[in-house]
Amino acid sequence: MNINPSIIILTINISIIITLLSSVFFFQNETNPSNLNSSSYSLGIFHNTSFNYLFSNSLFFTSLLKTLAILSLFPLFIEIIFNIPDTTVSLFNWLPNNGFSLNVEFRFDLKFNTFLSVALIVSWSILEFSYYYMDNDPNPNNFFRLLIIFLLNMIILTSTNNIFLLFIGWEGVGFLSFLLISWWTSRANANNSAIQAVIYNRVGDIGILLFFSLSITLFNTWSLPEIFSISAPNTFNNLLLVGLLIAAAGKSAQFGLHPWLPAAMEGPTPVFSIRHSSTMVVAGIFLLIRLSPLYACSSNFNTWCLILGSITAIFAATTAISQHDIKKIVAYSTTSQLGLMMVAIGLNQPSIALFHICTHAFFKAMLFLSSGSIIHSLNDEQDIRKMGGLHFILPNTAACIILGSLALSGIPFLPGFYSKDLILEIGLTNFSNFMGIVLSLLATLLTSVYSFRIIFFCFIKNPSFSPLAPINEENNNLTNSLNRLALGTILSGWILTNLTVLVPIITISSVLKTAALLLTITGVLFSISILQELTLNISPPTAYNTNSFTTNQWFYENISHILFLFYSFTISLSLSTRNIDRGWSENIGAQGIAITSSNASQSYQLSQTGYIKQYLLFSFLTLLIIIALSLTTISQLSPSFDI
């Protein structure tokens, strides 16, 4: 009996989605997190599997994600080995209508299977880390449940084959992001950051709503294959692409709609770790990857993506080198890498953008968890200038953050080298991409600068932290999650390059091919020389002005949050408040009627003086007016005589 491999892929993936959905409704008891693993050498693969132990100690979600992460590898390897085409399944027809049908349809292709495996492995590590990080939180189970729902919405967004379910996943990750950023509701900054994230994402949602409405209007369908097969008029097709670009820019924090991403670090470390690595911030890029047939032949759209991505990359890189908050540095590095993903979209290489998403997920999650470990161990200290010598008290965390920084810089044979350098090499094949690729190369140079800056201040510099800093690295929930991500960081680039990514043929010279690597080395040497000067208290003459510009994020927030808001408030005050509320509403509306009647009454009262002579005069004048009107009327009615 032959079993169709597509059936196996379909069964496993549907089972994963249903299991995640069902798990949200289980496990309602409130218990405290505990140490999950009996051994620190198992990378968390082997847990105590007793049901009572799992249930009573809040280990259900971690064990579930561990099982699903291992299970998700089977569809990926089956599709690679048997070269299975895309597997599409329609579960049922929802809201049937005569001229329009909405099918709940999923598409399990190589892109989704690759992303699913990466997302589940990374989320497994993050959730296990959460048991260490959220140890004293009063309500950890709801936090874990929200993380699962967050992941589930991202899986729905990446697997759906119609726009309606895509919209559900799209709005789901946005709403869950708001809940998780503002998890610590007593913090005003966390609440403000959550609102800021919602507002900026609302701008992006204008684009996705434009795309949805035009799709149903032009194509009378929300099915992606049908949309791809129908050609729209050029004008409407441009509007579709504009909507996609606005949506991706809002969700993936491209320049102009980026301020919410670094501000969102006010939430717990596991939140922005899962959001920056494998869920919300890559949703916009994955939207463009999934809808790549729409813009494959649109050179203008690709050019705009290239320009937007390169500006985002250089902006975030220049801002990161001036930050002192370790979480902000890693957050801006995420924005810079999102810019490189957008550059890959602009080069019409969506598969390479997905490749960078997958490799980026491992080392970025590891960097965030490592920074969380440092902050937790230093009593919530986040300033890298107050660190130094951390490898003495946190050797495992130190090794992981150094590995993540090297991977972020693009050191050979680490994942950043495989994916990031590939994007730059493809861009160098065509000099029409000159400006965008030059900015991307400069961003790569600065990436190595701020990556080495983290290493210098955290480990090479003399210790500056409190001598009473607690040592928390003996917790296996921390070490296993970090070590698992470190293993993924080391192996993911090589595995994905050889198994899932179809690398295009690149014909460039050896000098250009090594440009990214040379820039990385140059950046490290440059940062070493600058840090030595700063150590000797030698300040470059232009350091203050440059630092002020980059520290203040190119003054973008000063312009957008202060000037724009001031002028919008002024215009609203003059047009709306003064002209409408205090203008038409008061002078013509309810208050206007009262004022008019009051003025008429006051004018009439002037004639009521009580003098008999005045009354006789008014009566005589009234009589004369009546006589005059009567004579005029009689003369008009009498027949005319000829004289």
Curated annotation (Swiss-Prot):
One term under GO cellular component: mitochondrial inner membrane
Return the Pfam families for the record.
Answer: NADH5_C, Proton_antipo_M, Proton_antipo_N
Q: What reaction gets catalysed by this protein? A: a ubiquinone + NADH + 5 H(+)(in) = a ubiquinol + NAD(+) + 4 H(+)(out)
Report the membrane topology from the UniProt record.
Multi-pass membrane protein
Q: Name one GO molecular function term.
A: NADH dehydrogenase (ubiquinone) activity
Question: What is its EC class?
Answer: translocase
What are the transmembrane regions? 7-27, 64-84, 114-134, 140-160, 163-183, 208-228, 230-250, 277-297, 301-321, 338-358, 398-418, 437-457, 486-506, 511-531, 555-575, 615-635
Q: What is its EC number?
A: 7.1.1.2
Keyword list (alphabetical) reads: Electron transport, Membrane, Mitochondrion, Mitochondrion inner membrane, NAD, Respiratory chain, Translocase, Transmembrane, Transmembrane helix, Transport, Ubiquinone
Major localisation? mitochondrion
Quote the InterPro entries the UniProt record gives: NADH_DH_su5_C, NADHpl_OxRdtase_5_subgr, ND/Mrp_TM, NU5C-like, Proton_antipo_N
Q: Which GO terms describe its biological process?
A: ATP synthesis coupled electron transport; electron transport coupled proton transport
Q: Where in the cell is it found?
A: Mitochondrion inner membrane
Q: What protein family is recorded?
A: Belongs to the complex I subunit 5 family.
UniProt function note: Core subunit of the mitochondrial membrane respiratory chain NADH dehydrogenase (Complex I) that is believed to belong to the minimal assembly required for catalysis. Complex I functions in the transfer of electrons from NADH to the respiratory chain. The immediate electron acceptor for the enzyme is believed to be ubiquinone.
Q: What protein name does the entry list?
A: NADH-ubiquinone oxidoreductase chain 5
Q: Which organism is it from?
A: Patiria pectinifera (Starfish)
